[in-house]
Amino acid sequence: YFSRQKAGVIGVDVVDEMLEASRKNFIEAEAQNPWFKSDFVDLKKGDAMNLPVENNSIDVAAQNCLFNIFKADDLKQAIAEMYRVLKPHGRLVMSDPTCEQPMNEALRNDDRLRALCLSGSLPIAEYVKMLTDAGFGTIEIRARKPYRILDPVHYPTDELIYIESIEVAAIKDPMPEDGPCVFTGKAAIYYGSEDYFDDNKGHVLLKNQPIAICDKTAAALQALGRDDIY
């Protein structure tokens, strides 16, 4: 919708039938929507391990359930490919299940459950590390929602396993010297006697105005022990 130009969007799939179905859908969409042209989308055959896309050419890349389907080595390569094709400061936007509980091997090795976006779920810290290890300097966790329960009656597990769904943007910013900036919803409000507070590290807090801060900055502000920052 926001890229109404020829080949403004690139769609990649490894299955010929899926590519053909997409072409038919775009032709139908063009007939029903006067603003849409099927050539807005350039469909290419390829896979996540070797994207048929030039280096540093994409503003926004998107995926759904990549982390759940792939195992560690393939996942590392797929993330590296996303990083390669993004422009500097480009964004990889994602939606994936996550789970803070350990999963047994029966669950982890069940290809059907992985394909259903269930048993490949990673803890959030591990999820974020995969992204920062690839070079993404800024990570924004934009939403966390309940997703599924794996119970002993229907799945090979001895305990209830709670799975969340998260929405994340990984931004191809340079990696800061003191480590990545990971945003998980924290904010700071300065309410002191001055017009603003400057931490001399790039953060200026205007009086009584909330500002989103990364976890690293939140810890640094808390360590100051000030009674005029919330």
What positions do the PLM features span?
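Class I SAM-dependent methyltransferase SAM/SAH-binding core
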Residues: 1-50
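A short acidic, Gly/Pro-enriched loop at the edge of an enzyme's catalytic core
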Residues: 49-61
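A short SAM/SAH-binding and catalytic strip from SAM-dependent methyltransferases
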Residues: 59-74
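Class I S-adenosylmethionine-dependent transferase superfamily signal
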Residues: 65, 81-83, 131
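A short glycine-rich, Lys/Arg-flanked "PGG" loop and its adjoining helix->strand segment in the class I
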Residues: 76-91
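Short, glycine-/aromatic-enriched active-site segment of Class I SAM-dependent methyltransferases
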Residues: 98-118
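Short alpha-helix
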Residues: 119-141
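C-terminal lobe and adjacent flexible extensions of AdoMet/dcAdoMet transferase-like proteins
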Residues: 134, 140-146, 151-230
